[in-house]
Amino acid sequence: CDRRQRQMCIRDSGDTVDLSGRVIGKHDGLMYYTLGQRRGLGIGGMNEGTGESWFVVGKDLKRNRLVVQQGEHEELFSTALTAEKLSFISGCAPAKQFRCTAKFRYRQPDRGVTVTMHGDGATIDFDSPERAVTPGQWVVLYDGDVCLGGGPIDEVAPLKALPKIFTD
């Protein structure tokens, strides 16, 4: 798919596959699933599985495949993110590089991060790997109880990349 076609095909149903590429079900359209999602995958109760829950670990946009794996695998974790359009309540970042805390999900405890600004965006390195940080969601930055600002997540740096069969 080219970019425009990719936008359309993410709405189309397709195969749900495990990390080996084995088809284990069908999905309703990639746009309806997020990294780390466990519910609503339509693959529970598989006899061949380990009995652990299935989680979304990636999306193969080129082939319209939803990639899932059982259990808490490294593919669910990332070490950093990029946010290209951060906004700060004060009007500007506190410094070119600074330490603060961040939240990536509603009601999540604060997580220690180092923010390195580049233009209106930043690379945000996590103190420890974080589970299911997802492009399209927001990162919100804090100094104690004070909200510094935030913005949409554009990319994440995975702790362990998906196998090459999903990225070439």
Question: Language model features by range: what are they?
Answer:
Residues 1-10:
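Single conserved hydrophobic/aromatic residue that forms the stacking wall/gate
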Residues 2, 17-18, 142:
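Hydrophobic alpha-helical segments, especially N-terminal targeting/anchoring helices
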Residues 59-148, 153-168:
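Basic, glycine-rich polyanion-binding accessory segments appended to enzymes
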Residues 11-13, 137:
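Short loop/turn microsegments at loop-to-beta-strand junctions
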Residues 39-61, 162-168:
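Short, solvent-exposed cationic patches
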Residues 27-46, 100-111:
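Active-site-adjacent loop/helix segments that line or gate small-molecule/cofactor pockets in enzymes
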Residues 17-32, 50-56, 110, 133-134, ...:
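Short beta-strand/strand-turn micro-motif
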